[in-house]
Swiss-Prot record:
It comes from the Eukaryota. It is found in: Membrane. This is Putative uncharacterized transmembrane protein DDB_G0284801. Residues 23-35 have a biased composition (Acidic residues). Residues 1-41 are annotated as: Disordered. Keywords: Membrane, Transmembrane, Transmembrane helix. The keyword Transmembrane helix applies. One of its GO terms (cellular component) is membrane. It comes from Dictyostelium discoideum (Social amoeba). It is a multi-pass membrane protein. The chain crosses the membrane at residues 73-93, 96-116, 166-186.
Length: 199
């Protein structure tokens, strides 16, 4: 009886060691897969590649504060003069400027403020990109939160959340309008260059 009990204990211990060995092997395989997987995520890598090609001097979120400041000043200067070109300044520049600010600073608040400032006529003189740099450098928003009542902070956050949804809806409508306007002249939309509107 004692011999059988020892045998059972040895077999149980052996199975436990085997299971632990299998688990260790699985963990090693997972670690090797994670280490060897250098293509994740592919969209971000492609995005970085095209950004380097189109904007070779575009700083990243990990760039120095000086390079971000220079970039922000240039972006604000270009944004100020884009108001001279009505169609480009209203239809295309807000999306370009907002995207660049988001890629450099990576903040939802900066994204909303930039899109709002570039979209509303008459606000082009505001240096939004430079303000984003100052907020990142000196943490202005958290300092302001300390002196604002809680209800105002909640109101601002709710406004930002609602504005994000409105901005997405407006962008989709603008894209639809642009496609609808140019669709008669685009072959892949069933139109042609010789399209003539009949009244």
């Amino acid at each position: 009886m004692k011999f059988k009990r020892d045998e059972n204990q040895n077999s149980t211990h052996h199975r436990g060691n085997k299971n632990n060995t299998n688990n260790d092997d699985d963990d090693k395989e997972e670690e090797e897969e994670i280490i060897n997987d250098t293509t994740m995520p592919p969209l971000n890598n492609e995005e970085k590649y095209f950004l380097k090609k189109i904007f070779p001097f575009l700083p990243s979120r990990s760039s120095s504060s000086t390079s971000k400041l220079i970039f922000s000043l240039i972006l604000d200067l270009v944004g100020f003069f884009t108001q001279i070109i009505p169609i480009f300044g209203f239809a295309f520049w807000p999306s370009i400027s907002t995207y660049l600010i988001f890629k450099v600073y990576g903040s939802g608040l900066h994204l909303c403020v930039s899109f709002l400032e570039e979209t509303i006529p008459g606000l082009g003189f505001i240096p939004t990109a430079t303000c984003c740099w100052a907020n990142e450098k000196y943490n202005i928003i958290p300092k302001v939160d300390r002196y604002l009542p809680t209800r105002y902070i909640k109101m601002v956050r709710n406004f930002i959340s609602a504005f994000k949804k409105i901005a997405i809806a407006v962008a989709l409508i603008a894209i639809y309008k642009i496609i609808s306007y140019f669709s008669p002249y685009l072959p892949f939309f069933g139109g042609s260059k010789n399209h003539q509107t009949s009244y």
